[in-house]
């Protein structure tokens, strides 16, 4: 029936039968089409057709299931058009509605509903809403903690003291996270208990024989391979350079040592050899003909190897068996208590769900698992009778997106598939054993395997949902490509989506960086994508573009002045990357003289001009970056939409409605009440609110309104209100003098509020919210505003949430507000309502995860210089599904806390798995592009970074694994791969990287690497603004030529004030202003520095921006002002001090992120920190004002006229302290430092005035003056 021309590999995937078939389908390989065609061939087979309801087809999403059902229905309908009398086709069309094409959760739910009698659940059970589940979990854990405190459970108390810090919430979070994590294991109680028992070691314990030891050794061997390459590279240089051959022997010995370590299989031998090795000293021969550059280069490489080996020695030296044994024994009670605590919590949570006849999302899989599994007499997990019935029913089980399966899903699918074997626990891990098992009823058709699995492990990007790509990989490595085998694999790597330029670039990059270590698969020629799409010769493909910008490209104040740009705008790197992307889009779409890109339209079958809708900007995460990009693109007139999961609760209409609900529940809340009173719902003015507050400043705002209401209505005040009225006559006078209109307004609002409070009790919350929309007119008002359709859509979402809540077991307005608050914080906010159609002509911004399965003519991947998110590694207890618990070692009696050995191992394992996930996410991003791919990113210190990339280019075929392992951004991977590509030559030349590369790669992929800088982007922006302004000026001047007042206008515009020089001199100057004046070119006119006041938008009207460098400096200065050096012994102490400032609301949490505990600790432990500690007289943030002659600053002024003019210089001294022989002045600087001498010159005059101020104020000598530079963690002395 299909007219599609299938490739040989696709035909194998469609027609191969009687085996377990794994189809590895690369990006754009048409796997959905293949899966659908396989189903169609099965149900329409002329020899042995299979009814469609005898197939189980498991998809990843409901949308995928619906699409698959639709495709199959279309194919059957098309067949009926050709053969209307076909009984087979008619039957299959009828059965299609009964087909088992569904998600794994839908299948599990079907199993539960058909077999609820085997479980202790009500047949009328309901699946609880996610937020309802969160509320129940919080109730359960609060009750559990209260109970355990009450009975003074010793294990629980010890656990709290060790891991709860100051609040129980931290331990509660650990329990909730571990509970969620354990639910990804098929038998979660077994997993929890087994993981705790790993710490229960006896006297016979030998760490060297554990899997942990092997893991340490294997991870270190990856680094050793890198060291081997470095040493081999050094030997090559020695042999090919003049006069340094005497280095050959020691380098050869080092290389032999590394090779010996790589061959070791015993951890004991590996550890012993690395600890015992001493690097031989290099000969001190002098040879005047020696190649000094080569000599220095190999010495640097060897020093780097030596340093790393010493680090490994220190790590291995700490892995002493007795020490580790004691650590395990000490941690065992806590870990056992933790497992038991999670089990107790789960039982309490289960009881709460049973009371309400509820199950949650996790229960669906676990209940299904318990229905489908039994244990035999040997404790092996085997299929139940119900599972055997499913094996009889399903002729084939087809699983889509198999790479995203978790272990629970894998066990479920194995129970209903015809596979030989059983599951059992081995060393705490659930393993599948492919062996015969004895069943009371013989297994059905076990000789005919019936599993079809399709996916791409390179696109497995859901590890955070506990997806386990190893399930796919194990089969991929074990299954054979030979015909006739019972476990077979087929590879579909021909890409029918992208141009060859995109495919060649993707292949080049991932051959360089993806490996079993990072990515969990070697990306070889065999795994590489093959070109399958044809774009003809009419339009040539373009190279992949890499656009880089240096974060540290310093813009001088002169440049800022020249382009009239303030510091914040100039230095917001995300904003500038957004501006760069906007420029690229303008060029692509053709908003300039060069014309735009042509793309092929599949529907039209021809090329057309690129439209905005053809472009997507992909980001790793959109929450912080997308709004800034939207702003920049909008400035350039580019229509744009950002698909984010945030911002909904910040919209004005939702904040107003939630405030209204809050005061209906409890009006004694000033902030939400004032929000409603100022809104169109009540329309009070600021002056009216002030009049109300004058009644009494010591009670709530509502109580003030209530007093006015009662006295105005001549109602008697009860004792509660009378208590707050000190002078009733005074209050009566205030009310008497009050505007009559205001009093009526207050009465009207109070009466409405009382009515609403009463009504909220008697109707469901969703009805009540809609009643408020209509009663207040707010829904109609929101619709009349700008973006009214969007605002009303947001209000409808709140109504839908209320409707959803009304179906839960929780009732009432108070609980609904809690429900919304939990939704806000547990789900991390959510995006605004989507009112945008698919065909809207806008550029879309979305996360890489949301783009999976989609394709776009043009893809721009941005934010590639952003660090990977590794914050989870800092938690005090880590969890790993295979390795178990990784806790901190906490001894409360001795007040000792440090990461345990097993935590360090697990931390490294999770880090590598996270990097592998990031590698696959990068692959997904790059393979979304059909015709054009652009990558943008910011780099810290371009010259140094590129130099580092060049040092990693010794192997032309692969970026060293150790370098990939140490990567912190996508650019850390992309850069070293591309720097040795033949297309990077001009880029290297632009950076004046003249050193020759011996390993330039002549690959067929095409790249264009561009270096952008901030000055360039600022200049372009200003030039565009200037063109627009000049056009307006021209238009005005043309009109002026025809004006009767032309001469008078020119005369007035040409007027010059006689004492203009004097008017430009301020009466006060800050020290920073003085500094600026002194660093200006001597010829520069003073007026340029102190221009007349320019009007800007007030801050409250400015759009929210990221923390600027100047704000960063202010935050760090504020912290240093409050820093207690006596309580700063480690980073934890400093974090505590940061948290204290947050709690006292000196800084926000977002602002606290710019303070580096590591850098602060370096200051505290440094010379200046120690001197401050030893001083008995330390002063911080001391303001001063001193008077000086104006001519001291303004030397160009007439000396006779201005000899008596004075200026006030004012400033704030960061810190000064007293020692025996004088004062020490200290000033903190957060500037980026490029040149020490330049920094000294820049701040010399500033420090001079600080010194003069201290001399005048204290009468004491300033003996030392220092600048402390946080960017380099060091100080410089000012002479």
UniProtKB/Swiss-Prot annotation:
Highest taxon, organism lineage: Bacteria
Positions contributing to ATP binding: 25-32
SUPFAM superfamilies given in the database record: P-loop containing nucleoside triphosphate hydrolases, Restriction endonuclease-like
Cofactor annotation: Mg(2+)
Cellular component aspect of the GO annotation: cytosol; DNA helicase complex
Record keyword Transmembrane present: no
Catalytic reactions on record: Couples ATP hydrolysis with the unwinding of duplex DNA by translocating in the 3'-5' direction; ATP + H2O = ADP + phosphate + H(+)
Pfam families documented for this protein: PDDEXK_1, UvrD-helicase, UvrD_C
Domain UvrD-like helicase ATP-binding: 4-499
GO biological process: double-strand break repair via homologous recombination
Domain named UvrD-like helicase C-terminal: residues: 526-853
Keywords: ATP-binding, DNA damage, DNA repair, DNA-binding, Exonuclease, Helicase, Hydrolase, Isomerase, Nuclease, Nucleotide-binding
GO molecular function terms noted in the UniProt entry: 3'-5' DNA helicase activity; 3'-5' exonuclease activity; ATP binding; ATP hydrolysis activity; double-stranded DNA binding
Function of the protein: The heterodimer acts as both an ATP-dependent DNA helicase and an ATP-dependent, dual-direction single-stranded exonuclease. Recognizes the chi site generating a DNA molecule suitable for the initiation of homologous recombination. The AddA nuclease domain is required for chi fragment generation; this subunit has the helicase and 3' -> 5' nuclease activities.
HAMAP family in UniProt: AddA (MF_01451)
UniProt name for this protein: ATP-dependent helicase/nuclease subunit A
Organism: Clostridium botulinum (strain ATCC 19397 / Type A)
Lineage per the UniProt record: Bacteria, Bacillati, Bacillota, Clostridia, Eubacteriales
